[in-house]
Amino acid sequence: MERLLLLDAKDYDEDMDEFVRIAVRGIVFISNRLLLIEDNKGEVKLPGGGQDEGESDSDTLIREIREDTGYSVIPDTIRPFGYIEEKRRDFKSYHEGRIFHQISRLYFCEVSDERGETQLSEQEKQYGMRTALYTLDEAIAKNRAMLDNVGELAWNQREYRTLLLIKEHIENGGVS
């Protein structure tokens, strides 16, 4: 899988311990709108999340999209797009003093028409996470506005840059 982007804050010492997280995220279009997760502040992100030990990328993608959105991925539609790599000093207290190194693997896929219940974590519920559908341009504008208003939070910058890469891919004739 091709690396699409490296976001390296370079705010850490090279000799620090490293916490590596593998995430898998889905790029799903429904009637020309992108399937996203939106919080109560209006921030949007691709559905997906951390890979459990022993899980394949496909298994993680299927599980995470079902949990986040209630939709079921059609397995034979899964197509790799690339990955985003992030490195920065970990800001979570239980990993403080470590390098946070995340690799987000991105896949295009399709979902079935029927939608079930979401299975959000308590933290996701507290943030008011819900399923949303926006055009790609609307999603880019929402995250650009968040960057302008809130500043460059790590995941928001990742999501914004990812959406721009998806747009560039589609405009250059790539499959969505």
Regions found by a protein language model. Name each.
Residues 1-26, 31:
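Acidic, metal-coordinating catalytic segment for phosphate/diphosphate chemistry
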Residues 19-21, 29, 99-102, 126-128, ...:
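A generic fold-level signal
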Residues 28, 36, 108-109:
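Conserved hydrophobic "DFG−1" position in protein kinase catalytic cores
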Residues 39:
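Short loop/turn segments immediately following the C-termini of beta-strands
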Residues 45-49:
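A short gly/proline-enriched turn/hairpin at secondary-structure junctions
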Residues 51-79, 84-145:
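Unchanged
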Residues 33-34, 43:
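Structural motif
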Residues 44, 115-176:
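Nudix hydrolase/Nudix homology domain
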